[in-house]
Regions:
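Short acidic/glycine-rich loops and adjacent helix/strand connectors
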Residues: 1-125
């Protein structure tokens, strides 16, 4: 949730294989299109309005319970501060309540390393 889409995923790693069990994305295109770009304050409010619902939807789709979760991750930057704050607060709240580790993910590194979801390549690349 670093800009204008709120997203929640449940991911598992079994025997080195990474599986995306759920990936729920809520676009804000309809909110921002009349302005010709993203309005940070509107984006932050929209993230706040849906994050709890998306977490529930992602968990329901994954068919896991919170006790099956090993860690909680969230984009921690770079990005628009409001969206980042909503995502990090939601993730840290879950992390604390579930007594699970919190993993802060650099937005740009997440994009660069996403290839490793399908291919285990060695650094540097």
């Amino acid at each position: 949730s670093s800009c204008d889409e709120t997203s929640v995923s449940v991911v598992e790693k079994v025997n080195g294989q990474i599986n995306i069990l759920s990936n729920i994305v809520k676009s804000q295109l309809d909110i921002h299109q009349d302005f010709g770009g993203v309005v940070p304050e509107l984006a932050a409010r929209a993230h706040s309005d849906v994050i709890d619902k998306l977490i529930k939807m992602a968990m329901d789709k994954s068919r896991l319970s919170f006790r099956n979760i090993d860690a909680i991750a969230s984009t921690a930057g770079p990005g628009l501060m409001g969206g980042l704050l909503v995502g990090v607060v939601a993730a840290k709240t879950l992390s604390s309540a579930l007594k699970k580790p919190f993993i802060a993910v650099n937005h740009l590194e997440g994009h660069a390393l996403s290839i490793r979801l399908e291919t285990d390549i060695d650094f540097p690349y």
